[in-house]
């Protein structure tokens, strides 16, 4: 699934910090620390990052595209 532009609950724009989140996550930083530094404070917005699958720097979308 492609990362959403806005939080589903409150509507805040969250995609603007996603690239930095993804980069820092690959550098083995804690997700809690990253989101605090990026200013993502609402639980609903943090949920959007926590529930988005990232494995070895790849998203679920990257796996699905291979079977197109």
Curated annotation (Swiss-Prot):
| Catalytic reactions of this protein | RNA(n) + a ribonucleoside 5'-triphosphate = RNA(n+1) + diphosphate
Give the subcellular location.
Answer: Cytoplasm
What molecular function terms (GO) are annotated for this protein? Answer: DNA binding; DNA-directed RNA polymerase activity; zinc ion binding
- The catalytic activity of this protein is classed by the Enzyme Commission as 2.7.7.6
For this chain's record, the cofactor binding note is:
Binds 1 zinc ion.
Main location (coarse class): cytoplasm
> Where does it sit, as one GO cellular component term?
DNA-directed RNA polymerase complex
Q: Which keywords belong to this entry?
A: Cytoplasm, DNA-directed RNA polymerase, Metal-binding, Nucleotidyltransferase, Transcription, Transferase, Zinc
Which cofactors, by name? Zn(2+)
GO terms of biological process kind: DNA-templated transcription
Top-level taxon of the source organism: Archaea
- What is one Pfam family matched by this protein? RNA_pol_N
The record's subunit annotation is: Part of the RNA polymerase complex.
Tell me which family the UniProt entry assigns to this protein. Answer: Belongs to the archaeal Rpo10/eukaryotic RPB10 RNA polymerase subunit family.
Name the job this protein performs: DNA-dependent RNA polymerase (RNAP) catalyzes the transcription of DNA into RNA using the four ribonucleoside triphosphates as substrates.
Q: What is the protein name for this chain?
A: DNA-directed RNA polymerase subunit Rpo10
